Amino acid sequence: MKYSRKKLKNKVYLAIIDLPHGVKGDVLVKVWSAEPQRLKTYGILYDDTGRPYEIVVLRVQKNNAIVHFKGVEDRSAAEALKGIRLYVTRDQLVDDLAEDEFYQVDLIGLRVQDCAGQSLGKVSGFFNFGAGDLLEIRLNTRKTTVLIPFSKAAVPEICVTSGFLVVEPVAAGLLNNKEKNKVENDLDSNEDERMKK
């Protein structure tokens, strides 16, 4: 596959090359996937500049992979690869996900709305600082971004084909204290009304 800047526009960051492993050109590759063995099935991988990397041999080691790339035949060549990020294009990914699984690249750019259908903004990114996935949203009103937990409580509905996802503002922490108190008071009032019946 020939490098094309246009084709790599929709790239997906899958792994990063780490330390050399042995003296014959193998490297440890940290894979950002639950199934590191799939890395080879994607075919050609690319770096930030579009240089292609072809996997000749891949062995899984814990949640990472020991990889031998075509043309990398000694430790010195392997050392030169340390820190290179590896990407595939979105169309190289296999679409065999479960109903509640998504590729992050498919969610970026989706419209974000609350449970009443009011537009809040757009998904602009994902982060994980160790405590779980966070969804970055560029808000319409504040022209700023916020991070919310990417959980079923905060994001109860995702509809990729229709181009939107639903965010529950209370669970997502998007309300200020005044708005939060109003919602809590409304909930308490509703509960009181039900108790009277």
UniProtKB/Swiss-Prot annotation:
UniProt keyword annotations, A-Z: Chaperone, Cytoplasm, Ribosome biogenesis, rRNA processing
InterPro entries (alphabetical): PRC-brl_dom, PRC_barrel-like_sf, RimM, RimM_N, RimM_N_sf, Transl_B-barrel_sf
Keyword Acyltransferase: no
Subcellular compartments: Cytoplasm
Cited Pfam families: PRC, RimM
GO biological process, one term: rRNA processing
Parts of the chain that traverse the membrane: none
Protein family per UniProt: Belongs to the RimM family.
Subunit structure, as described in the record: Binds ribosomal protein uS19.
HAMAP family: Ribosome_mat_RimM
Cited PANTHER family: RIBOSOME MATURATION FACTOR RIMM
Protein name: Ribosome maturation factor RimM
Gene name per UniProt: rimM
